[in-house]
């Protein structure tokens, strides 16, 4: 009787001291629903890995492994990423496609299969995020990483890629009843859409950007399929403002529909878009250099760069960056103002320029407040004069307003009971 190629002979333990290999030469694997065929020597090519422990010929573990209905060895992991694990087991190298979005998950799979060399190959980008090579602010350390955005330095960005437009849109709805009702439901925003250049969108929104609809696009390409993971519109505005963007245009369309024919409640739905723009001067290379480099701080502090934009930068002026090619994390910074007298000279620098700009801003605000109070006093006086109208003028105005009212000959659509009552009352 001939045996098939997948069958193996049974050796009783009493006849020999060594246990023969119970695995076939070609092993069939079912990894998360994906079927793989590979050699047994490939699975045990790296000692002390998880696959080496599972398929090692030193111990008879073939009967202990889980199998599917067709007898294939089942591994409950990501079937799509397992192909890169097999590639690494074959020749100790792994080649990923361009703009591969699953790099973090592949690293987690390598850690599960106990492949330390593969983990090292997948961690160069994350090693750059160490505290020694970054310039962190106090806000980022306390925010648990939810609002952290990784902004590339200006030296790595092309000159024509530091500016651009970003469009933020959302479709909102709200339910409003009659005037004076307190149980009206306010704005609901199911999703905030982001359109623009991919590199700009990632720079502003970072990890809060959902890229599942366009995962493999190059950073210099444009997209209109991104959306944010949160639903607070004002939070998106704050993130855009911190990165130097300002709104240049907006539009909105509103439609209303009745809930039913017996009530006056309406559901208002709207689609609104806000267009933000960042000029090249608002994100010049001197912004991060003034905050991160001590050598160029004095020269660039005396230049014509706007100091108000420096307050939105994330790097503290007293921290140092190790190299100009490193990445910088952006976020708000709280700075303490130093009290200095007028009789001693002050060396100009970025911190002093920021203080001067804050003083100018406060003085401008004081002028606007005083001018606004004067205008309000003048307007109140004019209103008082208008209120002192005579009774005859008020009656004449009421008569003119009454003459302007035009009652239609007939009402074609009677949607509400009060319309029919009005017609009966005036015999129309």
UniProtKB/Swiss-Prot annotation:
It comes from the Eukaryota. The keyword RNA-binding does not apply. Transmembrane segments: none annotated. Keywords: Cell membrane, Cell projection, Membrane, Phosphoprotein, Postsynaptic cell membrane, Synapse. It is found in: Presynaptic cell membrane; Postsynaptic cell membrane. Residues 25-98 form the BTB domain. The modification Phosphotyrosine is found at residue 112. Signal peptide: none annotated. Its main location: membrane. The keyword rRNA-binding does not apply. The modification Phosphoserine is found at residues 130, 137, 143, 146. One of its GO terms (molecular function) is G protein-coupled neurotransmitter receptor activity involved in regulation of postsynaptic membrane potential. InterPro entries: BTB/POZ_dom, H1_KCTD16, SKP1/BTB/POZ_sf, T1-type_BTB. One of its GO terms (biological process) is regulation of G protein-coupled receptor signaling pathway. GO terms for cellular component: cell projection; postsynaptic membrane; presynaptic membrane; receptor complex. Auxiliary subunit of GABA-B receptors that determine the pharmacology and kinetics of the receptor response. Increases agonist potency and markedly alter the G-protein signaling of the receptors by accelerating onset and promoting desensitization. Homopentamer; forms an open pentamer. In contrast to other BTB domain-containing proteins, does not interact with CUL3. Interacts as a tetramer with GABRB1 and GABRB2. This is BTB/POZ domain-containing protein KCTD16. The gene is KCTD16.
